[in-house]
């Protein structure tokens, strides 16, 4: 979101503070370093305590979908290969664990061993985050997702 704000400000001819990119990088990089595979299993654990120890070991679909979108935005903004690698890592994890080829849709939650679970919230999620993870990487950082999509809709 910080990179979308930066791009939107620039598109509007307004000053975009340098800290927007720096903070976007720091947030993403820290999440990858502290939360991915921290308990010995791949994927982002849901929560960490103040000492960066896992509190909730579950993996939630929306966290991984948002990570894909963030990695794609950082790749678009910086061109740095590490963000493409994270994008691919996240999508590989989603494809192997969250997408349900039998029942359709995505599993909302995985347990600490990356098996479908329903401890935090049972059932299938809405597709809001999944759609964003699919659509955002193919769009520019500005204008917004809604504006980008609206500009490509044919009125009947």
Region roles according to the model:
Residues 1-156:
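Glycan-recognition and catalytic cores of secretory/periplasmic carbohydrate-active enzymes
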């Amino acid at each position: 979101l910080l990179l979308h704000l930066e791009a939107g400000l620039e598109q509007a001819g307004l000053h975009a503070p340098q800290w927007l990119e720096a903070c976007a990088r720091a947030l993403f990089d820290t999440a990858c370093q502290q939360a991915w595979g921290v308990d010995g299993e791949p994927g982002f654990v849901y929560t960490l305590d103040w000492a960066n120890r896992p509190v909730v070991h579950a993996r939630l679909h929306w966290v991984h979908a948002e990570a894909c979108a963030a990695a794609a935005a950082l790749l678009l903004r910086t061109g740095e290969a590490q963000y493409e690698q994270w994008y691919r890592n996240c999508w590989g994890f989603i494809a192997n664990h969250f997408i349900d080829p039998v029942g359709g849709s995505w599993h909302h939650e995985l347990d600490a061993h990356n098996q479908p679970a329903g401890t935090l919230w049972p059932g299938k999620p809405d597709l809001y985050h999944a759609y964003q993870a699919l659509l955002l990487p193919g769009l520019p950082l500005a204008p917004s997702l809604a504006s980008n999509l609206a500009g490509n809709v044919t009125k009947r």
